[in-house]
A protein has these predicted regions:
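Conserved, mostly hydrophobic/aromatic
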Residues: 13, 34, 69, 96, ...
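Mid-to-C-terminal alpha-helical segments outside catalytic/metal-binding sites
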Residues: 60-63, 76-112
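Residue-level detector of alpha-helical recognition elements and their boundaries
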Residues: 37, 49, 67-70, 101, ...
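Membrane-targeting and insertion segments and their boundary/processing signals
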Residues: 53-56, 70, 78
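Catalytic pocket-lining loop regions of alpha/beta-barrel enzymes
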Residues: 1-65
Length: 112
């Protein structure tokens, strides 16, 4: 059904502990995008952090969006945690730009 509909789906919090399940869905459905809010700050140092990095590497960075989850996570802390995560897992400059702002810009302009 995800391939039949044109409606964009923005999956929040990267699916949390189900990030690998979400990745499998998103790989098959070009209308599914994944937001990183909350999950990176919450799961720092866990196996889920590694699963998120694996999922981004597996899918590519084009449908992953930065999200702060403000006010539940302080905006500055969220940006800091996300940038540390991206650096720690060896993401390239263009992948970081995609995740941090380009994909969000493209998503909201494409589906306005």
């Amino acid at each position: 059904i995800l391939n039949v509909i044109d409606t964009p789906i923005l999956a929040l919090h990267a699916g949390g502990k189900r990030v690998l399940d979400l990745m499998l869905i998103a790989e098959q459905s070009s209308n599914v995008y994944i937001d990183l809010s909350f999950s990176l700050s919450y799961y720092i140092g866990s196996s889920i952090e590694n699963d998120i990095a694996f999922s981004i590497n597996k899918m590519g960075s084009k449908r992953w969006l930065y999200g702060s989850d403000h006010p539940y996570v302080d905006m500055n802390l969220s940006i800091k945690n996300t940038m540390k995560f991206l650096d720690r897992h060896g993401f390239k400059k263009n992948e970081i730009e995609n995740i941090m702002y380009k994909n969000g810009y493209d998503f909201f302009n494409k589906y306005k």
